[in-house]
UniProtKB/Swiss-Prot annotation:
GO molecular-function terms, A-Z: ATP binding; lysine-tRNA ligase activity; magnesium ion binding; tRNA binding
Catalytic activity: tRNA(Lys) + L-lysine + ATP = L-lysyl-tRNA(Lys) + AMP + diphosphate
Binding site for Mg(2+) 1: 416, 423
Protein name per UniProt: Lysine--tRNA ligase
Length: 508
């Protein structure tokens, strides 16, 4: 930041500190304990829409909010007051305010208000309603009270925060000047409530599981590691809620879910944040086909509640979330896109050579045809799946917690839901055979010992739970942040997380 700008900001802050001191000496704040509002700005706008131009309504109202703009013209002034619900104009008339001040009914005079209260300050006012000759509903102020003095200027109301990263670092400023950002987080809150309500209405029970875990499992991801001092024990922030929710199914809860935070020590992008929110759902006596139906019903219902329809627009593209959605197997989609039939490949070298021949990158760490199939899908297919598509039947090598397919050797009963080229949900017919599960986790542990930091370890307590007996179960995980991105037309996950993790700011 240029030195001249820093100097100007420092001078402005000093001026505002002087005003704060002046208000304090007048007995008016500058930091109040409380204020009793009779209405929100939205209530006033809605309830008095019939007030004609030039008319007053002798109804005393009290309203509080932040001063967004101010215009002082001699003995008149006009302020714009904003609260969470909207804005309203304050009509400030010297004679009216000074008359109230002389009767000791108010906290200050017109001159004190117009010289000591700046844009950014929080104030509470009491007055009557009038509609100006220009048609603007206004509160004709009689009394005013400073509630909190702002020592920093607001961003320019016309240009907002031009620096996108500053919007994320100082979200409070972004929310002040951007109605779109406020609407995004309002929709997020409504969406989370709607998801919980939908599940609760269908007899699913939300039960919290540990965030700190002795063994990180339930996903192929690197965990964050911490340490418990009293127990002298390494612990991990959870990378999924899956294994503990399955324990609850073993214990007799037939419909269970948890909506909460997940932590993965991985890269950041427009689609990834190390701390994110998911909902995992488990239903006894169900399989992955049942979970497809549940996913369609849940997402389409919530979309209708939040967006008003199952047809929405995302980044200029119309998306139709009306069920039923397309279903296609991974190997069929790859074959359509590349001409390669991975189900016919029995040899890793042959599959790798075929991938290279059609221009696909062959990762050096791939050690099976199944992993190459998944790699080909990610490179050649994933971004093309714009309309909601269930991608079915994944390779067993990349799905250690999913049940083997009932009729397709080498595959598991798993789907991922893709919308606008992004994975939005993941589900299995859950693996409930404890012996099969042990073999797969031991294979994962061998991969981890060989250097794969995303591979699972062996969770002996989870295996013990499976040996007690788990009923046939369908499991589902939905990424809340990506769903919010879709429902709010947001291009980056940072737009829908109030305080995303960012790189340290460079000091100049």
């Amino acid at each position: 930041m240029a030195r001249s700008v820093l100097s100007a900001l420092s001078e402005l802050r000093e001026t505002r500190l002087e005003k704060a001191q002046a208000l304090k000496e007048l007995g008016n704040g500058p930091y109040a304990l409380r204020f009793e509002s009779s209405h929100s700005t939205a209530n006033l706008q809605a309830d008095h829409a019939d007030l004609a131009k030039g008319e007053e309504r002798l109804l005393t109202v009290s309203v509080a909010g932040r001063v967004m703009t101010r215009r002082v013209m001699g003995k008149l002034a006009f302020y714009t007051l904003a609260d969470e619900t909207g804005t309203i104009q304050l009509y400030l008339e010297k004679a009216t305010i000074d008359a109230a001040a002389s009767n000791e009914l108010a906290s200050g005079t017109f001159v004190q208000l117009t010289t000591l209260v700046d844009a950014g300050d929080w104030i509470g006012v009491t007055g009557v309603l009038r509609r100006t000759d220009r048609g603007e509903l206004s509160v004709k102020v009689q009394q005013w009270q400073i509630l909190s003095k702002s020592l920093q200027p607001l961003p320019d109301k016309w240009h907002g925060l031009a620096d996108v990263e500053k919007r994320y670092r100082q979200r409070y400023l972004d929310l002040i000047v951007s109605p779109q950002s406020r609407e995004t987080f309002r929709r997020r809150a409504l969406m989370v409530s709607a998801i919980r309500r939908w599940l609760d209405d269908r007899a699913f029970l939300e039960i919290e599981t540990p965030v700190l875990q002795a063994e990180a499992g339930g996903a192929e991801a690197r965990p964050f590691i911490t340490h418990h001092n009293t127990l002298d024990l390494p612990l991990y922030l959870r990378i999924a809620t899956e294994l503990h929710l399955k324990r609850l199914v073993v214990g007799g809860f037939e419909r269970v879910y948890e909506l909460g935070r997940i932590f993965r020590n991985e890269g950041m992008s427009t689609r990834h944040n190390p701390e994110f929110t998911s909902v995992e759902v488990y239903q006894a006596y169900a399989d992955y086909i049942d979970m497809m139906v549940l996913t369609e019903q849940l997402i389409s219902s919530v979309c209708t509640q939040i967006c008003g329809s199952t047809r929405i627009t995302y980044q200029g593209i119309e998306i139709d979330l009306t069920p039923p959605w397309r279903r296609a197997s991974m190997h069929e989609l790859v074959q359509e896109a590349t001409g390669l039939d991975f189900m016919g490949f029995k040899d890793l070298a042959v599959a790798a050579s075929a991938m290279a021949r059609v221009g696909l990158e062959v990762p050096s760490k791939a050690d099976s045809v199944g992993r190459l199939l998944n790699e080909a899908f990610e490179q050649a297919v994933e971004v093309s799946l714009i309309q909601p598509t269930f991608v079915l039947d994944y390779p067993i090598e990349i799905s250690p917690l999913a049940r083997q397919h009932r009729s397709k050797p080498g595959l598991v009963e798993r789907f991922e839901l893709f919308i606008v080229g992004r994975e939005t949900a993941n589900a299995f017919s859950e693996l409930i055979d404890p012996l099969d599960q042990r073999q797969r986790l031991e294979a994962q542990q061998a991969r981890r010992q060989a250097g794969d930091l995303e591979a699972h370890g062996v969770d002996e307590d989870f295996l013990q739970a499976l040996e007690v007996g788990m009923p046939p179960t369908g499991g589902l995980g939905i990424g809340i942040d990506r769903l919010v991105m879709l429902f709010t037309d947001s291009p980056s996950i940072r737009d829908v997380i109030a305080f995303p993790l960012l790189r340290p700011e460079l000091k100049t």
